[in-house]
Every structure is written in C-alpha cells, then in structure tokens.
Amino acid sequence: MDTLFRLVSLHHHHHHQHAASPSPPDQPHKSYPSSRGSTSSPSSHHTHNHTYYHHSHSHYNNNSNTNYYYQGGGGGGGGYYYAEEQQPAAYLEECGNGHQFYMDEDFSSSSSSRQFHSGTGAPSSAPVPPPPSATTSSAGGHGLFEAADFSFPQVDISLDFGGSPAVPSSSGAGAGAGAAPSSSGRWAAQLLMECARAVAGRDSQRVQQLMWMLNELASPYGDVDQKLASYFLQGLFARLTTSGPRTLRTLATASDRNASFDSTRRTALKFQELSPWTPFGHVAANGAILESFLEAAAAGAAAASSSSSSSSTPPTRLHILDLSNTFCTQWPTLLEALATRSSDDTPHLSITTVVPTAAPSAAAQRVMREIGQRLEKFARLMGVPFSFRAVHHAGDLADLDLAALDLREGGATAALAVNCVNALRGVARGRDAFVASLRRLEPRVVTVVEEEADLAAPEADASSEADTDAAFVKVFGEGLRFFSAYMDSLEESFPKTSNERLSLERAVGRAIVDLVSCPASQSAERRETAASWARRMRSAGFSPAAFSEDVADDVRSLLRRYKEGWSMRDAGGATDDAAGAAAAGAFLAWKEQPVVWASAWKP
C-alpha cells in the first residue's frame, strides 16, 4: 500500500472521529504509487553546524503526547523526530518564521518516510497522525505548517480552508489530471501540478486535500521530490494568503543579513567546481569576447603603427559592460587569455559591472568592493592594464541610463562588448526597447546567456480571468520542470552535506516563492526561451555570430571535467512557436534537457 493512499485512507478512517470534519462524498479514493521506496536520505543524520545556521536540538522517541515514533529507514532517512526550539532569529526569518517554515531538522512526516522499513518499502505498524482540522493541532510541528495555517482568509479565488482535508473529488479542476504517477516517476511533480490546477479551478476542497498531502511529504532536507514539494508548497501558501511579496522580502532580508564576501565566494567557486551550469556560459561568452577584442586590438595596433612611428603609443582600450549575476567570476580567465594571446602590447581592459538590486544593499556593495580589489590585483599579476567599476542600480534594469555610464571613455575605447549573463530576464518591462538601447551603444559583440525556461506570464489586466488562470498553470508547470532539472543536477553534483549546496537551494526556494506567489508585475522570475530572446535580438538589429570551432572545443573540454549527464547541443533547431524564429548559439543540456543557452550577437 503506497504512501499517499495511506494518507487518504487514514483521513477516511479518522473522519468519524472528528465531529468538526465535513462528511466526505461517497466515492473511491485515488492511489498514488510511492517513488521513494527504500531510498534513504542521510540529511537528517548529519550535524548542521555550518556557516549559515546553527541548530540546537533535543531528541525524543515514542513521545507519549504524539503519534511519532523512531524508524530506522524510509525516504527521510529515519532517525528521531527533532524538537523545534532555540533557533536563531536570523534562521527563523529566512525560513519563514511566520508559519514555522523549516523549523524541523527533518520534515519527513511519519506518513511519508518513517512509516517505511528500510529496504522493503512496506508500511510500518506505527500509527499515522490524523489530518489537520479546525479542532486538531499539530503536536509535534512535523510539517511546514501548523494545522491552523490551513484556514485561509477569503481571497479572490474564494477559498475557505476550515475543516479537515476532503476526500479527492472526481469533479472540478484537476480531476482529470489525477492520473497516478508511475513508480519510476516523481510524485512531487504529479501532486504539485494537481494542486496548481485545483487553485486555478477554484476547487477549495481539492486544494486543501492536496496541500495537506504535500505538507505531510515535504522536507527541505530530503530528496529532490521532498525539497521541491517544500519550496512550491511555501509558494502556494503565500499565493493563497496573498502574502507573496511580504514573504519574499522576509526571505531576501534574512539572506542578505547572512551574506558576506567569503560566503559568496565559497558558494560561487564550489558551484563552478562541481557543476558547469555557470562555467558553460562563461567559457562560451569569453571565447566570443576574446576573439572580437583580439581583432579590435590588432586593427588598433596596425592603425597606430601606420599613423605614427612613436614607440609610446598607448595600448588599445577595450571595455566590457557586464550585466550579470555571477559576481565577476567570469573575468579572471579572460584576463589571463588577454595576457597570453595578445601578439603585441597587451590591451587595456575596463569592466563596468552593473549590480541590479531591488533596494540599495550595503552587503552587496561590500561584496562588489572586495571583488573589484581582487580583480585589480589579479590583473596586475597578469600584466594587463585594468580598471574596474561597479554600478549599483536599484529597480528595473530598463531604467538604467546607459549613456550616463560613459562606456566609450570620451572616445578612447576602441571596442565595446556587452555581456548579459542571466540579466535580460531582470528587465520587467520594455524588453525590446532595452535590447534596442544596447544596439545604440554600437558594441562589437553582445553575449547573451540565459536559463532555458518559459516563465514570462502576462499581466493580470492584460487578459481574461480564464486566460490568467491558464497562464498560471502553464508557468507553474514550466517552473516545476526547470527547477526540477536544476535541483536534480545539484543532487548529483554536490555531496549530501554541503553549506554551499544549502545556500543554492535556499536561493531556489526564494525564486519559487517569487514565481508562484508574486504578481507578474513584481516578479523577478521572468525567464524566456532561447528562441524568444533570439527574436528580440534580431528585431533590435543584431545578427547571430556562430561560436568558432575553438570556442566549441573549449566548451566540450570543459564538460568532460564534470560528471556524466552534461552535454552541449546546437540551439539552431529551437524555434519560437509564436513567430517561428530560430534560436542561435548553443545549449547546455542536463540529461538531454536544455537548461542554459549561450549565444553571441553582432550589430
């Protein structure tokens, strides 16, 4: 008997024991095969004594006041259920203390993991707690939410979460999507999509029942399914309570408080060491920029030698406008390449990095100041004349005054490159106009690296209510696909216990809350597909510049350094369904699924 069927059956069994619970309709229960079996996650066994948070726990088993027991196996890795006391204030804020998010060391509920014997997957005889109801409290606080959290105020989708979870209904939104996932599939995607359809269909009973199931199964310290369920459940809860922007601000503030140069550096370097997710775009973009700059430097040197015989001709000045979110980890390799591949005088390189933020951040300024100092020191070691400037821009990137940046340095700059790494998706409005403004800079090359996902949703007032609901389901499903691939790659690339992995997963949690719960006009998660970006670039007057064979070889050599599963694919076959425009550049694929797109463009 599988996990979810036992959850539903248990509710039916306890229905007669709770007078406040509504009578379920007379219909059969749906079963959901468990995908975990005996898979064990060791996350509940290690000591969380790391940079970001410090935990203090008291252990107990067979507590007389609860129905939770110690089990040695199961999807959550077994172990004792932990109390939730003495958490630091910063930890509680980042993890959503308003609803006791992430308060437990192991959120795997008794019904989702500790009810399975190790290696067999058979249910244990330990009792399972009753479903939350208006009169039932969560004694142990084992899930993401307390029972009272499932009583929502009346909002625009007319939800009323008051009683205990209802038996699955065969009618209403999401009923047709209730096909049981295969044993080899992942249960989180099935349940989360059903829940999203129920939210869009305003099926309050279905939403309530599915959210309770997800609350029982979710854990930010479990396997990929449990983590996805945890983060998306948090986003759905924030959406239903119209608290998305406030929740996101709380999470972002706590994360910013814990930010430092050392922690940022460790996370970025470890991510690049274990995953090609960011190095793929860096290598491809650097290759295109370097080839373009070397051509400009050679042309400048030839012009200088023909016009003057003086030996004091200044080096060619090159400038990069860096619109990225990778903390300048891209540039040391470019500085080294300029030093080793310049035939004559090494050109002077200037980098202007734009750091977009929702609000001015002292922590971000400290980090970028330290990064600039280290880049300047490295450039001196490489013998490259170098200058660095960080521009902190609060608000939409579309409001950035590019002309005020003086990228041409009074006409001294011989060649300008614009590097956009995960930056264009930060433009909330007027994306075509912003790309056109890049064209007016007359750059020698523009490199664009974006994650491959179609998460751009229409504004709420731009379409009918039905279209908006359909768009929510579409964006939710695409976000689930994209973040599943990302989390899966982290799962296979990082060790089970890693501070850096925890930091990256926390960022995923914030991104999911943003995507699911924030209005489209306020969301920063507005990724588009490669074909869509290619259409915008062509409309602005850019033409695709194919990566040279040398650059392609460098990328393939890079991927061989990482675990199996990564590959490079030509993006030429990807098309925009709306306009039929073909993409350009190359894809980084994880298990044959495109996840990152890199391209180069010339005016």
From Swiss-Prot:
The ranges of region (Leucine repeat II (LRII)) come to 370-406
Region of interest called PFYRE, as start-end residue ranges on this chain: 416-514
Q: Where is this region: VHIID?
A: 268-354
GRAS domain span = 179-602
Show the segment(s) annotated as Disordered. 11-58, 106-140
Q: From start to end residue, where is composition biased (Basic residues)?
A: 45-58
- For whether the record's keyword set contains Transcription regulation, the answer is yes
Low complexity bias (residue ranges): 31-44, 108-125
- Place the motif VHIID on the sequence: 318-322
Q: Which GO terms describe its cellular component?
A: nucleus
State the coiled-coil residue ranges.
Answer: none
Q: What is the name listed in the Swiss-Prot or TrEMBL entry for this protein?
A: Protein SHORT-ROOT 2
